[in-house]
């Protein structure tokens, strides 16, 4: 309800803002895009007779870097995030290091609950102009904030060649060097420009993906091969079912991720940030859904919604009903590890690999985890100072390495793999005590596979709907006509997207 009210507030403010801008134009007074305010759009259930929010466009304006870049002004930069004590401790160490270079840039680091809590608080504060300088974000968060152009674009900052003086007597260019740009894992970096206008709104901070966890002890004992394609996955499930008829061979945590990833692997349409947004009702997508329905009917799989909890619980189970494979977040590796006994021994060894692909060379795995965005402010020096801080954290190999080891998330830089401490961390990788290192190692090995989906006001609705669609199609009574049931389910999902998006 709160999100819905804020959505209405936002739509009204956009209309008033447009009127005000028109009036200013008539009076030959330039409109200041930095003064626009916004609240959150409702991605879950807006009435269609409510004002339709605008889509983000280039009219939001590309941030113009001051001629002198950072002028040494004393500023306080507020950073909203979700870090617990262990990660905040790492951050604080690097804030201190940053302040040795820029003592007049004071960082106010604030933990704001969950990712959704950050989104909701920022959205509320945008309506009254008290938003922070920097915030953890996901793409759909930025799409909401951008309904009124609240997020500063980063393109001019990234490309700036202005030389900035630091307190230790050294200098750096304000923007990114070619070497720094090239060090980012491509899929993580590309996420910042997926909003339909070609502009860069976010920088990757720390990331995760989905990986395939499997019971290595069971696989080795039964001569099973780890599936690398979906065809091999079906064969593996069949063999496991023969060996253990009570098992559910595969658990998949995120129905939405599964659907979207299959679209990426097939190269079929899902959504678009511009034009017609909801494109997922097509023959290719209906076909793979039908295939997974057949797997479900054979008892090969379950999902988080169907199981009623994360499928890691089924994977680590020592009861009669268990799974031997689980597809879930790379950042949750320790939850995929069974409990050790009193002597520290685990009931089985866990293996980790890339999720199955189609075998068509179009390998894709989802990019997840927080990015950071910078908000527009009246004082351009706050934006520039915010950029310097974000640049410092996202290009620091030492910070990325230490943060990754503490968090279980994956660093966003390729070169972190060569960091001595991180290389030692990866060298310990195993399917027991150091399972987080094994997960990170797999993630780094598949750095060319990462994808992100278009972000727009309504993209989270599409995500929810395709997840619900997959669940429904696995279990629904088809009345003897599976194709008709699936077609209707797709049509209904599109209608829900158009109504609520």
Model-derived segments and spans:
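Conserved C-terminal helix/tail region of periplasmic/extracytoplasmic solute-binding proteins
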Residues: 42-47, 52-57, 220, 430-432, ...
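Extracytoplasmic/periplasmic substrate-recognition and gating elements
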Residues: 100, 106, 128, 198, ...
């Amino acid at each position: 309800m709160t999100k819905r009210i804020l959505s209405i507030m936002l739509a009204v403010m956009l209309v008033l803002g447009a009127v005000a801008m028109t009036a200013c134009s008539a009076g030959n007074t330039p409109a200041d895009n930095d003064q626009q305010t916004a609240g959150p759009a409702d991605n879950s259930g807006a009435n269609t007779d409510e004002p339709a929010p605008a889509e983000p466009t280039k009219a939001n304006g590309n941030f113009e870097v001051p001629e002198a870049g950072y002028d040494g002004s004393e500023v306080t930069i507020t950073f909203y995030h979700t870090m617990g004590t262990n990660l905040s401790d790492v951050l604080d160490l690097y804030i201190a290091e940053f302040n040795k270079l820029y003592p007049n840039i004071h960082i106010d680091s604030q933990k704001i609950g969950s990712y959704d809590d950050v989104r909701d608080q920022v959205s509320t504060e945008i309506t009254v102009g008290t938003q922070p300088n920097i915030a953890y974000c996901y793409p759909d968060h930025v799409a909401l904030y951008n309904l009124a152009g609240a997020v500063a674009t980063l393109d001019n900052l990234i490309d700036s060649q202005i030389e900035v003086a630091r307190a230790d007597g050294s200098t750096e260019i304000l923007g990114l060097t070619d070497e720094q740009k090239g060090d980012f894992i491509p899929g993580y970096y590309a996420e910042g420009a997926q909003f339909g206008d070609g502009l860069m709104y976010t920088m990757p901070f720390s990331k995760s993906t989905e990986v395939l966890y499997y019971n290595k002890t069971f696989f080795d004992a039964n001569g099973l091969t780890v599936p690398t394609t979906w065809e091999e996955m079906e064969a593996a499930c069949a063999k496991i079912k023969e060996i253990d008829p009570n098992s559910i061979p595969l658990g998949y945590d995120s129905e939405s991720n599964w659907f979207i990833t299959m679209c990426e692997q097939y190269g079929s349409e899902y959504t678009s940030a511009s034009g017609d947004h909801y494109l997922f009702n097509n023959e290719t997508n209906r076909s793979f859904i039908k295939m997974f329905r057949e797997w479900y009917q054979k008892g090969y799989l379950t999902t988080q919604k169907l199981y009623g909890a994360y499928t890691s619980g089924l994977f680590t189970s020592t009861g009669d009903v268990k799974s031997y494979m689980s597809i879930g977040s790379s950042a949750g590796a320790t939850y995929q590890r069974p409990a050790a006994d009193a002597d520290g021994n685990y009931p089985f060894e866990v293996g980790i690999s890339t999720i199955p692909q189609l075998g068509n060379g179009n390998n894709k795995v989802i990019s997840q985890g927080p990015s950071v965005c910078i908000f527009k402010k009246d004082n351009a020096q706050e934006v520039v100072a915010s950029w310097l801080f974000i640049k410092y954290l996202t290009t620091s190999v030492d910070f990325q390495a230490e943060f990754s080891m503490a968090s279980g998330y994956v660093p966003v830089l390729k070169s972190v793999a060569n960091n001595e401490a991180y290389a030692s961390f990866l060298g310990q990788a195993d399917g027991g005590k150091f399972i987080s290192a094994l997960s990170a190692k797999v993630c780094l090995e598949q750095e060319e596979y990462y994808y992100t989906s278009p972000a727009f006001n309504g993209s989270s609705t599409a995500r929810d709907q395709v997840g619900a669609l997959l669940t429904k199609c696995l279990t629904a009574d088809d009345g003897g006509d599976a194709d008709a049931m699936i077609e209707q389910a797709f049509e209904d999902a599109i209608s829900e997207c158009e109504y609520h998006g």
